[in-house]
A protein has these predicted regions:
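Acidic catalytic/metal-coordinating carboxylates
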Residues: 14, 41-44
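Basic, Lys/Arg-enriched C-terminal extension of HTH/homeodomain DNA-binding domains
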Residues: 168-198
């Protein structure tokens, strides 16, 4: 049974496949994003998609359905949050609401609870990053060196150094390690899956 009758559904097994699909297809109306999708570290994928494709609504689908995760997803620009434990009917309802311009979250979640002013300030800094800077920060969080990041992104090492400098300035920190710590604070333990190497 199709969740959305008459819809064309494309699937991506990893975040890189998703971004390639978004670059290739111009008629995508909605993205369902799993926070634990390969290639994503917590909210980094959501932040990247909202920066790169602001016109395409993103609905987070996740097994992590605590109030804090849902609130942070919405703060970072998700149009909805659907816990994986919900059935097809709920998924259909949520997608319908989002496609009509509304937002959807579980009714038992208070989106205004637990807002930490310090976290809000850090979040505000993080969302000033460009999509490429978000990608670089994701890779820094994985412990990659500038040379490795440059190779992965197909740019020069000097370009990566410039991105890292801009990231440090925008986040108000002095080192790569501090930038990764800020990113980890913003999304709890969900931003970073691997500790950066020394």
């Amino acid at each position: 049974m199709s969740v959305v009758p008459a819809a064309n559904i494309d699937e991506a097994g990893a975040f890189g496949e998703l971004t390639a699909l978004l670059e290739k297809e111009s008629d995508i109306d909605l993205v369902l994003l799993d926070l634990s999708m390969p290639g994503v570290s917590g909210f980094s994928g959501l932040i990247y998609l909202r920066a790169q494709y602001p016109a395409i609504p993103v609905v987070v689908v996740s097994a992590s359905d605590d109030g804090d995760t849902i609130r942070r997803s919405m703060e970072f620009g998700a149009s909805g949050f659907i816990p994986k434990r919900f059935g097809v009917e709920t998924l259909r309802e949520a997608i319908g609401k989002v496609m009509n311009g509304d937002v959807w979250t579980p009714s038992d979640v208070d989106l205004s609870a637990g807002v930490d002013p310090d976290m809000a300030k850090l979040r505000d800094r993080l969302i000033t990053l460009t999509p490429q800077q978000v990608r670089v920060l994701m890779m820094l969080s994985e412990g990659l060196l500038n040379k490795q990041i440059a190779y992965e992104l197909g740019v020069s090492e000097a370009t990566i150094k410039a991105h890292v400098s801009a990231i440090l300035q925008k986040l108000g920190v002095e080192s790569r390690t501090q930038a990764v710590i800020v990113a980890a604070k913003i999304s709890g333990n969900q931003w970073r899956q691997n500790e950066p190497s020394a």
